[in-house]
Structure formats: structure tokens, C-alpha cells
């Protein structure tokens, strides 16, 4: 288990209050990167909130507490009402069916608001009143927020899940794109499905105590829920993230070390 020394994002917000826009954006970009990673691997968190977002010694966000998470299956919907009330989507507190990603998007919208404002968009000590506020989707918008980020928050806090922004729309939003580190969303490089990474296969074998032929068979089966295949693709993705991060650090090093321009 990884030790994360920076504490909860919640405590950071309590200590610092509303964050500067550039800092809020940096945290939010990392959160969306992590949520996107979960969704691409068919996992919906369902309890995203600052208390479940941890900070490491470099102030990088780590998503934690997957106790209420669930696997997404094609054509199937979820109904369980779970998560923290202040961050729960309208369809969740109403007991309606939901696919999964859209409820995480709502929670991320609440988190973004909290980062920028130091308060919650929907809050009340009386839970029924809180639920009524959430279902209306009406929340105060401070005058100091710029129009771009207000537009993004409003897209994420749409009561109708069909009108709510999805991950791809968030990633393409002009506010989100500012100073976006390339390693958070590595470019999708199409790989030859016939080429199998032997290092990743060996790592799966070591972790699960299986033979390489079993991993090969799992990959050939193309079963999206096979644990060996999932582990293999997670290893490949992690390596891709690490490679992109290393490139970014090297680029930053050369930029920082460049001589100043002549005046």
C-alpha cells in the first residue's frame, strides 16, 4: 500500500480557504485524469469528495477509498444510493437508475466549486432541504469567478445527466486546457494487438502466480472483465504515464536551464 504524506485535499481547503484559480485548476486537472483512468477501466468511484483525495509530498492528487466503487457493465445500470450527500448527484439521491460516469462527473463539479470558492454549492444541515437544493441544481455563483470556469462548473452540475458534461467535453474545455501537463492524458498510441509486452506479462505472472501462457490466453480471449487481462493493461497504461511524466520533467529541465534571451 502506498503511503501518501500530504494528507487530505479536504484539510488543505480548510486550511487555505478558496484557492487561487491556477492552483485549483492544477488539482482539478489531476482529479479528472484519475477519474478518466478509472472510467476507461470500467470503474465508477461513486464517493468522490476532497476527503477521499490525498496529496503526496509533491502535492499530486491520489484518488482513495474505493469502498463504494463498482464495475460498469455494458447495458447495465446502477441504482444504489451511496456516497456523501453534499457530493451526490440528483439521480442518486432520487433513487433513479444511472450508468456510473455521470455521477462521478457531478461530484467532480462540486469539488471544483469547493476548490474555487472554499464552500459547497449545495449545503444544509437538514438533509431533506439539502436534497431539495441538489435537485433544483441552483447554486450561488461568486462574482470573482471568471466566465470560463463558471461555464465548466455549470456544465458539470446539470441536473439532467443527459445534458451533463462528460469526461471528453471537460478535457476539451478551454479553461481546463490552460497549462495542462501532457503526461496527465498520454496520447493514445495504437498498438499492434499481436505484439505482447513480455515485461508486462512477467509482472502479471509474478503478481498472480500464473504462467505466461495463462496471461496470453486471457489477452486473446478479449474478455474486458478478465483480471489477468485487466492487470496487464493497467501495467501498460502505468508505464505509458510514467514515460510521459519523465518526458515532461526532461523538457521542463531544459526550459529552466536555458540562457536568458539577449535584450
PLM region spans:
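Eukaryotic serine/threonine protein kinase catalytic domain
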Residues: 1-180
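A short, hydrophobic secondary-structure junction motif
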Residues: 111, 259-260
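C-terminal regulatory tails of eukaryotic serine/threonine kinases
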Residues: 162, 168-259
